[in-house]
Structure formats: structure tokens, C-alpha cells
Design a protein with these regions (language model features):
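Cytochrome P450
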Residues: 1-417
Length: 417
């Protein structure tokens, strides 16, 4: 039997400079012309770009596997090309193994667990804004350190080292794989994370506290306690998921609010609108743009002939702008409701940190608007991530504002002497 060719073939590389310059336009074209298409980039993969394809694939774990395999090289299975991270539980597991691990993660990321973190989140947001508030000018991206500090602190690690975790885990998914930054993350920063986190797990095994790491040590998976390797696997994923995504959401939202002063004023006048606005920011900015799966068997999928072992990229960002699902999808309507966006993914792997991410984003946007309501962004000075393929966002957002007063009695972290 002759093999069906993979088609239609498109010119698409989500890690290219061309894509970074206009990822919204690139996905619009794909969605309109061939929502399930093959590209030869990075060894070849399918790109799923319309809402129905992404919806169907993300709910079909039987055909679209998240498990680590030899297809597409070595490393983290859910991105293309794969990145050299440790095995990540539960995101690289399919059912049935997946379920009991996800239950253990849900226990520390549930809405109730996140409500207990309210004061911690507020403290970090206040402390980060304190660091810049008296100056009248700063890089707004600095405030984006909050999610990393909260995540690291929640796991019981030293929050003052939050930047080292960002340099490691966020860089692997936001810097071009051929850059010096990426090589530093892979060869220096990630090994440091592994050494530090493994030492932390060992210390908590000796002496548990009330942090999330101790909760994993006490949790049962299939009627047994987890090994250090399993716990490390979960912690590295939580750090990886926690440090960059919310920062990307908030910084993009703050730049948009600067460009749309009328909408900014509405949120200043009525902060209770922020919750719904955050959902719209999630939809249009889609911090995690696209993640991957591996096809488990030859199959026909929405007109395309998939083969076992093919890699597939599901674009949440593109699905989130599908006009068949959202009226005027390129309009940012901060009152849009309902808003069935897929920014947190869909199906069994839907983001375990969504409640934490939302809580941090609401607190950060709320406090910036309250304490720095007149911030002016130097738009020409904005530096985007050079690669917008997996995570979209900004590295730097110079801004000025009317100075204000610090609120915490002392800085969050000891000052370097
Ligand atoms: C705005 C913030 C966030 C966005 C946009 C986001 C996005 C996503 C997406 C799209 C997925 C689906 C992965 C897949 O289907 O393969 C996911 C999964 C996940 N996220 Fe998030 N995330 C955010 C915040 C967080 C935070 C704060 C944490 C934890 C500290 C976190 C931890 C996780 C974990 C553990 C998974 C894997 C769940 C599983 O495999 O069952 N995320 N996230």
C-alpha cells in the first residue's frame, strides 16, 4: 500500500523571527487556509490551529499522547523541538498512570489551597512594587518576578533566589534554542536548580513543614509514598509552569492597558472588573502559545492522514482567536463573557496552576493600577522575547509614573551589601 503524503504542507516555524514578528497573523493565515497542516520545520510536525481541531486533539489522549518517547528526539515531550528538562510529572504521562499524580498536584493547587496563599501573594506583590515605587521610573517587567517568587516560596525554597529559577526554567522555553542564553540555562542554570531542589527535598524528608514540597512527601500515589525522583519531577514542572506564564500574561496586559487608557481607567474606577478582564487577557495574549503531542497510531484526523510517531503542535493562541468561537476575536473586550478560552489548555492536562495563576495576575494588575495609575510606557524601549513560539511576552518594559510610598516595613529580600 502506498503511504498517504502528509499534506497540506505549509511554511511554518513557531520559533522563527518571522513568526515572532507577527504570530497572530501567522496563525490567522493557517487557521483560514489549512487548520491541520504539516510543516517540515524541526524534523516535521502537524500544526493544529483552529478551535475545533485543538479542542478535539487535546481531549483525545488515546490518539494524541503526552508521554515522553523517542519520536522527535530526546527531552520534554510537550514542546517542539524538545527541551532538555527532567521528566515532568504529570504533564508527560497519559492515563491511567497520570491520574493519581494529578490528584496529588490538585491537592495543593485547588481553589481552597490558593485562597490560603492570598496573604503571601499580596505580600510579594506589595514588596515588588515597593522596590520601584519611590523612583518614579522602572522596568515594569521587574514586577513580573512576583509569580516566580510566589511559586518558589510556596514550594518552601528560598524566594530571594527567584531569578535563578527564571533564568533556568523560563529561558528553556522562551529563548531561541541556538542562543547563548539557552546554552547557559541548559548547562549551568538548570543543573543548579536540580541540585538545589533535590537538597530541599532531602531536607524536607528529614524535617517536614507546611510547604507544598512537604505535602508531596506526605501524599500517596497508588497507595504508596512517592520517591525523591518523582517529587523532583513534579517540582521542576511546577517551577517551570509557575515562573514565566503569569508574568507573560501580566506584562502583556499592562502594556495593552497603557495603550488603551479608557479601558485602564475603567479598571481603576471599578477594580471588581479585573477578574473578567483577566480572562480576556488570557484569551488574547495566550502566554503559553502552543504545546505538543505525539500521535500514537495511523489515523485520519479532520481530513489529515496522521502517522504513528508524528509530532503535533496544538496552538491554544490560535484557537483563542478563532472567529467561529469568538465574536470579533482580535478585539480585546475586557467585559467579554462567557469566554471559553483555551489559554490553560483543555482536557486532562488542563493547567493545574490556573487558580494560582489567576490569583497572582489579579493581584498584580490590581495593585499596579492602584499604586501606579498613571504609568507611561516607553513603547520604543520595550524588548520582546526574541522567540514567541512557546511563551509570548516581554523581557523589558521601561516606564515612568508618579512616585509613591513603600508599604512594607522592610524589603522582601535582604539587600546585597
Ligand atoms: C497565566 C498562567 C498560566 C498559563 C497560561 C498556563 C498554561 C498552561 C497550559 C496551556 C497547560 C496545558 C498543558 C498541556 O495540555 O500539555 C498547563 C499545564 C500545567 N500548568 Fe499551567 N499555566 C499557567 C500558570 C501555572 C502556574 C502558576 C502553575 C504552577 C505553579 C502551573 C502549573 C501547571 C502544571 C503542573 C500543568 C500540567 C498539568 C497536567 O499535566 O495535568 N501553571 N498550563
Amino acid at each position: 500500500m502506498t503511504e498517504q503524503p502528509r499534506c497540506p504542507i505549509v511554511h511554518f516555524d513557531h520559533h522563527s523571527a518571522e513568526h515572532a514578528a507577527d504570530h497572530v497573523g501567522a496563525y490567522r493565515e493557517l487557521r483560514e487556509e489549512c487548520p491541520v497542516a504539516w510543516t517540515d520545520a524541526h524534523g516535521g510536525f502537524w500544526v493544529l490551529s483552529d478551535y475545533p481541531s485543538v479542542f478535539e486533539a487535546s481531549r483525545d489522549d488515546d490518539l494524541f499522547s503526552s508521554a515522553r518517547s523517542e519520536h522527535g528526539g530526546e527531552g520534554l515531550a510537550i514542546i517542539i523541538p524538545k527541551a532538555p528538562t527532567a521528566f515532568h510529572i504529570p504533564i508527560e504521562l497519559d492515563p491511567p498512570q497520570f491520574r493519581s499524580y494529578r490528584k496529588a498536584v490538585n491537592a495543593v493547587t485547588s481553589p481552597a489551597a490558593v485562597r490560603r496563599l492570598t496573604d503571601v501573594i499580596d505580600k510579594f506583590v506589595t514588596g515588588f512594587i515597593d522596590e520601584i515605587i519611590e523612583t518614579g521610573e522602572a522596568d515594569l517587567a521587574f514586577v513580573a518576578g512576583v509569580p516566580a517568587a510566589v511559586t518558589v516560596d510556596w514550594l518552601g525554597l528560598d524566594a530571594s533566589e527567584y531569578k535563578r529559577y527564571v533564568d533556568a526554567m523560563h529561558t528553556l522555553v522562551s529563548a531561541p534554542p541556538d542562543s547563548a542564553e539557552y546554552a547557559h540555562a541548559r548547562d549551568v542554570a538548570v543543573p543548579w536548580v536540580e541540585k538545589t531542589v533535590r537538597a530541599h527535598i532531602a531536607a524536607r524528608r528529614e524535617q517536614p513543614t507546611d510547604d507544598a514540597t512537604s505535602a508531596f512527601l506526605a501524599a500517596e500515589v497508588d497507595d504508596r509514598k512517592m520517591t525523591d525522583d518523582e517529587i523532583y519531577s513534579i517540582l521542576e514542572l511546577l517551577i517551570s509552569g509557575g515562573v514565566g506564564t503569569t508574568a507573560s500574561l501580566v506584562t502583556q496586559a499592562l502594556v495593552w492597558l497603557y495603550r488603551n487608557p479608557g479601558e485602564r481607567q475603567r479598571l481603576i474606577d471599578d477594580p471588581s472588573m479585573i477578574d473578567v478582564a483577566v480572562e480576556e487577557f488570557l484569551r488574547v495574549f495566550s502566554p503559553t502559545q502552543a504545546l505538543a503531542r505525539t500521535v500514537t497510531r495511523d489515523a485520519e484526523f479532520r481530513g489529515a492522514h496522521l502517522r504513528a510517531g508524528d509530532r503535533a503542535l496544538m496552538s491554544w493562541a490560535s484557537a483563542n482567536r478563532d472567529p467561529r468561537q469568538f465574536d470579533d476575536p482580535d478585539e480585546v473586550d475586557i467585559t467579554r463573557w462567557p469566554n471559553k478560552h483555551m489559554a490553560f489548555g483543555l482536557g486532562i492536562h488542563r493547567c493545574a496552576g490556573s487558580h494560582l495563576g489567576r490569583a497572582m495576575a489579579r493581584a498584580m494588575i490590581g495593585q499596579v493600577l492602584e499604586r501606579m495609575p498613571d504609568y507611561v510606557v516607553d513603547v520604543d524601549g520595550i524588548v520582546r522575547y526574541p522567540d514567541q513560539g512557546t511563551n509570548a511576552g516581554y523581557h523589558s518594559i521601561p516606564c515612568s509614573f508618579t512616585p509613591g510610598k513603600r508599604r512594607l516595613a522592610s524589603p522582601l529580600f535582604p539587600r546585597a551589601s
